[in-house]
Amino acid sequence: MSRVCQVTGKGPVTGNNISHANNKTRRRFLPNLQHHRFWVESENRFVRLRVSAKGMRIIDKRGIDAVLVDIRRAGAKV
């Protein structure tokens, strides 16, 4: 399963670990993804999404119905 938020599309990015001696080694910065069940009143069921912390804030702000419309428009089966 890919490490991508279903709401924001955020995924891993790459960068460097930098030691005290300024040695650089490559690393990945992973998004803060959580599996979360959201109650969808219009469908009378739960929907399980893999969302980042920012994605949860977007759902709180816009509402789960509006976000699901965008996710389904993008082609994801939810």
From Swiss-Prot:
One of its GO terms (cellular component) is cytosolic large ribosomal subunit. One of its GO terms (molecular function) is structural constituent of ribosome. Pfam families: Ribosomal_L28. The keyword Ribonucleoprotein applies. Residues 1-20 are annotated as: Disordered. GO terms for biological process: translation. Keywords: Ribonucleoprotein, Ribosomal protein. HAMAP family: Ribosomal_bL28. Belongs to the bacterial ribosomal protein bL28 family. This is Large ribosomal subunit protein bL28.
